[in-house]
Swiss-Prot record:
Source superkingdom: Eukaryota
Name under which the protein is recorded: Unknown protein 24 from 2D-PAGE
Organism the protein comes from: Bombyx mori
């Protein structure tokens, strides 16, 4: 979900 995209952005 969106949480994965957030981790990738980090």
């Amino acid at each position: 979900g969106p949480e994965v995209t957030f981790l990738k952005x980090m």
